[in-house]
Regions:
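Transmembrane-helix bundle segments that line or gate the permeation/cavity pathway
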Residues: 1-98, 102, 155, 159
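Transmembrane alpha-helical segments in integral membrane proteins
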Residues: 28-54, 125-128, 203-222, 287-308
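Short alpha-helical interface patches
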Residues: 56-60, 223-224, 229
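Membrane-embedded translocation segments of transport machinery
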Residues: 67-69, 77-220, 227, 232-286
């Protein structure tokens, strides 16, 4: 929050509330609205209008009947998919490397980590949608729920639950304000450095995530689709960020550990620094490393499937 104009130096409780509101802005309804709206367009065009699963199919006959233009648009969509996944793989490799170094004092070239994740993704894709991608995704969610419950139980449980209720109120109260804030009266660089970065990332992932969502949503009504793609993921993100975010904030407010310094110096190790003040530190770290790998493998799988389409 160093670049955020409404930060009050020394007022940790105020800044903590703002931090979670901005986190929910960057990872909540706004981002999933991008996926749900584009995914609904893909689903309607493909299942109701019998068009191909391509971005160009959404732009009307004038584009569809112009083969060079349609091909150019589809190529751009593929390139944005590759760039979006590459950015995520790079950040994921950095966190995996940081975790291995911090917890086990093992240093691995990040390129090797990316190659390893890519190979796992290719194996999963070759096994098919049901045998590979579906089962890996189910394993991924099982591990994620288990880790979330462990942090909630091992961390400051009452504080986390109380804070999440307050976070919900702050987010809903500031929803319109945050959605329309353009820094018109500030000379800060927060929006360019954070909000625009996150939303650009959402848009880069939009073609393949939306197409993937449409492919697995056959037979759903529009109402079911919107609930399942917009509201359910946003709620899951709110819970996830609330549990992990407030566990970290509790440590900062009570001068426990060095997570604040870790975020400032090397953000890739911050998650593992959080675990230092909990029991089962090594277990939590190992589970997190496995989860990071499976998250990025499933993301790569989805991208590969949609690029093939």
């Amino acid at each position: 929050l160093n670049d955020y104009p409404e930060m009050i130096e020394g007022n940790l409780s105020h800044n903590a509330g703002k931090a979670l509101s901005l986190t929910n802005l960057h990872w909540g309804l706004h981002g999933w609205a991008i996926y749900s709206s584009l995914g609904l367009c893909f689903a309607y065009a493909s299942y109701n209008k019998k068009k191909a699963f391509r971005v160009s199919s959404l732009l009307g006959p004038s584009v569809e009947n112009n083969a060079p233009l349609a091909a150019s648009i589809d190529i751009i969509a593929i390139l944005t998919t590759v760039i979006g996944i590459a950015t995520s793989l790079g950040l994921g490799a950095s966190q995996i490397n940081g975790g291995l170094d911090y917890v086990f004092n093992i240093k691995i070239n990040e390129f090797i980590i990316i190659v390893f994740i890519t190979i796992l993704g290719l194996i999963s894709v070759c096994l098919g949608l049901d045998l590979g991608i579906k089962r890996l995704s189910q394993l991924n969610m099982f591990i994620a729920v288990g880790l979330l419950l462990l942090i909630l139980i091992l961390g400051p449980t009452i504080f986390i639950l109380n804070a999440m209720v307050q976070n919900a109120g702050l987010y809903l109260n500031q929803f319109i304000q945050l959605s329309t804030w353009t820094e018109a009266y500030n000379n800060s660089v927060y929006q360019n450095g954070y909000t625009l970065f996150y939303f650009t990332w959402w848009f880069a992932w939009a073609p393949f995530v939306s197409l993937f969502i449409a492919r697995i949503s056959y037979g759903r009504s529009i109402k079911e689709f919107v609930i399942g793609v917009l509201f359910v993921p946003s709620l899951i993100v709110f819970i996830w960020m609330g549990v992990f975010g407030n566990a970290a904030i509790y440590q900062v407010l009570n001068n426990i550990g060095d997570i604040g310094a870790a975020v400032s110096s090397n953000a890739s190790t911050a998650l593992f620094v959080l675990y230092d003040s909990m029991i089962l530190t090594k277990v939590l770290s190992i589970i997190s490393l496995i989860l990071i790998v499976t998250f990025f493998v499933t993301s790569s799988d989805s991208g590969d499937l949609c690029r093939d389409t």
